[in-house]
Amino acid sequence: MAITAAQVKELRDRTGAGMMDCKNALTETDGDIELAIDNMRKSGAAKAAKKAGNIAADGTILIKNGEGFAALLEVNCQTDFVAKDSNFLAFANAVLDVAAASKVSIEDLKAQFEETRVALVTKIGENINVRRVEYIDGANLASYRHGDRIGVVVAGEADEETLKHIAMHVAASKPDFVNPEDVPAELVEREQALQIEIAMNEGKPAEIAEKMVVGRMKKFTGEISLTGQAFIMEPKKTVGEVLKSKGATVTSFIRLEVGEGIEKKAEDFAAEVAAQIAATKKA
């Protein structure tokens, strides 16, 4: 049976697949579009399963406000080229819309968009992963995105400009906690034990070592907490001092960065080029 251009166009419109893929699928089914779609979906699932082992450490961070909260979403792909692809971004934004509508869990988001994800993996040719979603509550929220790779939302009692500046600070300085006193006791105890050992190894008398450790611990908890850090816009003041001068407070924040915690495969380009040259010589 001859496959017409109209049939190929219809299949492309319905699946988003390439022209030759559509033509081949229709040829295999003697022009049966519905069967071709079924076969392409099966083939897509198989391809997606093969791609699942590929490391997806690139991607985008998106932010959207809901009713009294904000949603932050990370969707991953394998390359920065695909991270800018309109189809990839449309998929990520569709997931975000659902998340921001009713605080949908990451498990439910993945399940709801799995079929769409598989189709996109087939079309683009890279592993794609809806990795994580975070929600932050607050009547006063300010967000900041640094490019497509870092997203921050801050909640607190302050004017919008102040919270925006704090969000920018969080993006740059990566605090782990809001206040020094929020640092967990076990983390403080572990660091304190380490600092005592370091001071003793330096041969300091016990009294001096103790005072040194007190100072070092204050510095430690300050450096990993938002209000204890030097404010990037006024380095001579801490964030806490800036907030106090404005009668403002920060209650919570969330910071997401693309690929955090994902172990990326190290690429040795020199070795890759050498291997290509060797292969050429053999040929």
From Swiss-Prot:
Compartments where located: Cytoplasm
Any single GO CC term annotated in Swiss-Prot or TrEMBL for this entry: cytoplasm
Main location: cytoplasm
Signal peptide boundaries: none
InterPro entries the record matches: EF-Ts_dimer_sf, Transl_elong_EFTs/EF1B, Transl_elong_EFTs/EF1B_dimer, Transl_elong_Ts_CS, UBA-like_sf
GO molecular function: translation elongation factor activity
Alphabetized UniProt keyword annotations: Cytoplasm, Elongation factor, Protein biosynthesis
Ranges where the record places region Involved in Mg(2+) ion dislocation from EF-Tu: 79-82
Similarity comment text for this entry: Belongs to the EF-Ts family.
Biological role stated in the UniProt entry: Associates with the EF-Tu.GDP complex and induces the exchange of GDP to GTP. It remains bound to the aminoacyl-tRNA.EF-Tu.GTP complex up to the GTP hydrolysis stage on the ribosome.
PANTHER family: ELONGATION FACTOR TS (PTHR11741), ELONGATION FACTOR TS, MITOCHONDRIAL (PTHR11741:SF0)
Entry protein name: Elongation factor Ts
Taxonomy of the source species: Bacteria, Pseudomonadati, Pseudomonadota, Gammaproteobacteria, Alteromonadales
